[in-house]
């Protein structure tokens, strides 16, 4: 059974990446000072701008 992942059929929708950029906020506290770090990942490859699937997704070469 497959589930719909954006415009791409994937066996597990949790394995598919989201469109655009993703941001993670990491706050590290050591002794009396804190440091905030923002990590930005580049978007995954798209198929005609309609479909994104992560490398472990069953539909890595889906046709959208």
From Swiss-Prot:
<comment type="function">
    <text>Metallothioneins have a high content of cysteine residues that bind various heavy metals.</text>
</comment>
<dbReference type="GO" id="GO:0006878">
    <property type="term" value="P:intracellular copper ion homeostasis"/>
</dbReference>
<dbReference type="GO" id="GO:0005507">
    <property type="term" value="F:copper ion binding"/>
</dbReference>
<dbReference type="InterPro" id="IPR044671">
    <property type="entry name" value="MT3"/>
</dbReference>
<protein>
    <recommendedName>
        <fullName>Metallothionein-like protein 1</fullName>
    </recommendedName>
</protein>
<keyword id="KW-0479">Metal-binding</keyword>
<keyword id="KW-0480">Metal-thiolate cluster</keyword>
<dbReference type="GO" id="GO:1990748">
    <property type="term" value="P:cellular detoxification"/>
</dbReference>
<comment type="similarity">
    <text>Belongs to the metallothionein superfamily. Type 15 family.</text>
</comment>
<dbReference type="GO" id="GO:0008270">
    <property type="term" value="F:zinc ion binding"/>
</dbReference>
